């Protein structure tokens, strides 16, 4: 969607007097918030559900970055160093990691943390999917039914498959890798190392100095950078061969070109990389990350 049109305006209840709970994206907080729509006019930042709002608009604002400006090694009035060559643009170093949000399958994922290389100003050394829980304790252990004999369906995160899977919990003891729903499990544990992402992306910081030459005061602007990241295992499957003779236009995700492409499905069997619409394919297989 057009972010400027559907996500950036402040909510507008409109002139009518109806009472329709709706959701709008607040660019200042980076969150979808509820408001009351009157029923007519208003603007496009008006979404029927929170899920719809987050799918269209969720972007995390990176306003809390901390920068360590270079030290002025050549202060004015230092006559002993007045003839030394001084670099006009000393490097800018980042103290903190950058965090962005991602949406896949119409729900927000956990934060991607992009770690900046020490003393480098143009790329990042690692990207990983993290959550607020202790991964070693809540996600890494194998599921444990416990000694009791109850029959309680639960979910656990399997680090080998990278998926949340169901198991039967006995009702007592066990370990922390034990969730009531698949959604909670994925929220806490779903993470994939993104080493294949091409992390030396085109993130080039533009330095802006004040009028006093060599001053340590500096601000850094960061442009939007997009990454397409495949997270769903079915998206790595090849296009399924046409075994049957049906003619059903479908879409599959091409992991080489990192795009969804059209193909003709024969009508029988499938490896999961088979989608009715282009939108369904992209929602399942592509994550748009924005710094």
From Swiss-Prot:
The keyword Disulfide bond applies. GO terms for cellular component: extracellular space. Keywords: Disulfide bond, Glycoprotein, Protease inhibitor, Repeat, Secreted, Serine protease inhibitor. It is found in: Secreted. Its main location: secreted. PROSITE patterns: BPTI_KUNITZ_1, BPTI_KUNITZ_2. The record marks 17-18, 149-150, 245-246 as: Reactive bond. This is Kunitz-type serine protease inhibitor 6.
């Amino acid at each position: 969607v057009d972010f400027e049109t559907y996500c950036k305006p402040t909510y507008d209840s409109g002139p009518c007097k109806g009472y329709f709970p709706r959701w709008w994206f607040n660019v200042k907080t980076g969150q979808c918030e509820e408001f009351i729509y009157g029923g007519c006019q208003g603007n496009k930042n008006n979404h029927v559900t929170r899920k719809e709002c987050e799918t269209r608009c969720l972007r995390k604002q990176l306003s809390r970055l901390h920068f360590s400006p270079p030290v002025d090694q050549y202060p004015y009035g230092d006559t002993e160093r007045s003839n030394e060559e001084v670099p006009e643009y000393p490097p800018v170093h980042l103290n903190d990691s950058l965090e962005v949000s991602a949406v896949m399958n119409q729900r927000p994922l956990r934060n991607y943390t992009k770690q900046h290389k020490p003393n480098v100003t143009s790329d990042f050394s690692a990207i990983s999917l993290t959550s607020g829980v202790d991964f070693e304790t809540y996600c890494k252990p194998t599921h444990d039914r416990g000694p009791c004999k109850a029959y309680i369906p639960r979910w656990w995160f399997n680090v080998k498959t990278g998926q949340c899977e169901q198991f039967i919990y006995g009702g007592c003891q066990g370990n922390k890798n034990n969730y009531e729903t698949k959604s909670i499990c994925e929220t806490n544990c779903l993470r994939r190392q993104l080493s294949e992402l091409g992390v030396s992306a085109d993130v080039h910081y533009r330095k802006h100095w004040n009028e006093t030459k060599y001053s340590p005061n500096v601000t850094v602007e960061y442009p939007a950078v997009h990454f397409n990241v495949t997270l769903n295992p079915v998206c790595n499957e090849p296009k399924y061969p046409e075994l049957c003779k049906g003619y059903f236009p479908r879409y599959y995700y091409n992991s080489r070109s990192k795009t969804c492409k059209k193909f003709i499905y024969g009508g029988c069997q499938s490896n999961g990389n088979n989608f009715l619409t282009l939108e369904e394919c992209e929602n399942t297989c592509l994550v748009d990350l924005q710094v």
